[in-house]
């Protein structure tokens, strides 16, 4: 690499891990005009900066090359495979089983931008317009699944999608999901049960206000 590096550039160790997932065709294939690592660095720059595709710096591959390759990677599911294997590796390093038996469901509202379009909704509880990200993580905080809705969608209504998603990526290993009080009610409980998961609501102590540490999960 002859250009000045960007903070978003992949390190040598990171590249050694991700490269096998990204090789949809040989690195020296005749139709490849740019090094694969340079294309991946272009994608990382876009993700890190949040800039428009057409604002890609001139010392990175053309924006349309990076965009088209990113679409191929997404269609091939390489990022899901990458996250799945990395999560399993990190769990084994921590002395845990490869797949979790307990997970955590939660949701977070993200402020909208002009580009949000129809995805934006109004979260009356948090008084914020935007999108709501519903996520599932294991007890180490490693991502299992994510689902995006308008901010006005309630967390409890997304249990079905999250429960089915985590069972798919963990080969049906999950038995318990911990949630906060935003997931109370029979519907979310039954939706989780249909996927073979027991939903456990962790309640805050009513007498306490402000920051409260929930029981260890």
Segments predicted by a language model, with ranges:
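Short alpha-helical elements
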Residues: 1-217
């Amino acid at each position: 690499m002859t250009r000045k590096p960007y903070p978003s550039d992949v390190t040598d160790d990171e590249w050694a891990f991700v490269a096998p997932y990204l090789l949809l065709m040989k690195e020296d294939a005749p139709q490849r005009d740019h090094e694969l690592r340079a294309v991946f660095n272009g994608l990382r720059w876009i993700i890190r900066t949040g800039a428009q595709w057409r604002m890609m710096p001139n010392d990175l591959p053309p924006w349309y090359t990076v965009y088209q390759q990113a679409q191929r990677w997404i269609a091939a599911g390489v990022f899901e495979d990458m996250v799945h294997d990395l999560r399993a590796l990190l769990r084994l390093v921590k002395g845990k089983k490869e797949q979790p038996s307990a997970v955590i469901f939660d949701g977070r509202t993200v402020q909208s931008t002009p580009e949000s379009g129809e995805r934006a909704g109004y979260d009356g509880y948090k008084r914020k317009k935007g999108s709501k990200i519903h996520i599932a993580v294991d007890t180490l905080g490693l991502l299992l699944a994510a689902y995006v809705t308008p901010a006005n969608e309630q967390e409890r209504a997304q249990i079905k999608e999250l429960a089915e998603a985590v069972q798919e990526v963990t080969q049906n290993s999950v038995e318990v999901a911990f949630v906060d009080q935003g997931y109370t009610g029979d519907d979310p409980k039954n939706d989780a049960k249909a996927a073979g998961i027991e939903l456990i609501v962790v309640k805050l102590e009513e007498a306490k206000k402000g920051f409260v540490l929930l029981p260890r999960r």
